[in-house]
Amino acid sequence: MKFVVWPSEIDSRLPRKYGRLVKKEVALEAPTPEEIRDAAEILGMKVIEFEPEKLNPRLSGIDEELRTKGMLRIESPYPKGKSLRMICEKIRELRAKKRKAHGKRKKR
């Protein structure tokens, strides 16, 4: 299945009115297009198109700080909803690993 993914679809700071598609408990704070791309590729999904500067038209009416730029066209064997939940879970794992690695470096 091919579909478009906007970072706003998995951003916990946004209400569903502005395009969040996953539950707030599953969503992430301020996901970046690069994080989404990396997570999708690790999960075996194919990123067909990647436009980090594109803005979701739904976000034109909200505060600048909540506007998350980026658009990805992804091909996945799973439906969009399941793919988004998997991507959120993988980004959460990657962020935890990054924090853990960063924390280890500080201890000397």
UniProtKB/Swiss-Prot annotation:
Keyword Nucleotide-binding attributed: no
State the SUPFAM superfamilies in the record: SRP19 (SSF69695)
Arranged from A to Z, the UniProt key words for this protein are: Cytoplasm, Ribonucleoprotein, RNA-binding, Signal recognition particle
Keyword RNA-binding belongs to the record: yes
Q: Which GO terms describe its molecular function?
A: 7S RNA binding
Q: What are the disulfide bonds?
A: none
Q: Which GO terms describe its cellular component?
A: signal recognition particle
Q: Which GO terms describe its biological process?
A: SRP-dependent cotranslational protein targeting to membrane
Question: Where's it found, cell-wise?
Answer: Cytoplasm
Q: What HAMAP family does its record include?
A: SRP19 (MF_00305)
Family (UniProt): Belongs to the SRP19 family.
Description of how the protein assembles with itself and partners:
Part of the signal recognition particle protein translocation system, which is composed of SRP and FtsY. Archaeal SRP consists of a 7S RNA molecule of 300 nucleotides and two protein subunits: SRP54 and SRP19.
Mind telling me what this protein is named? Signal recognition particle 19 kDa protein
Organism listed in the record: Thermococcus kodakarensis (strain ATCC BAA-918 / JCM 12380 / KOD1)
Lineage, uppermost ranks: Archaea, Methanobacteriati, Methanobacteriota, Thermococci, Thermococcales
Gene symbol? srp19
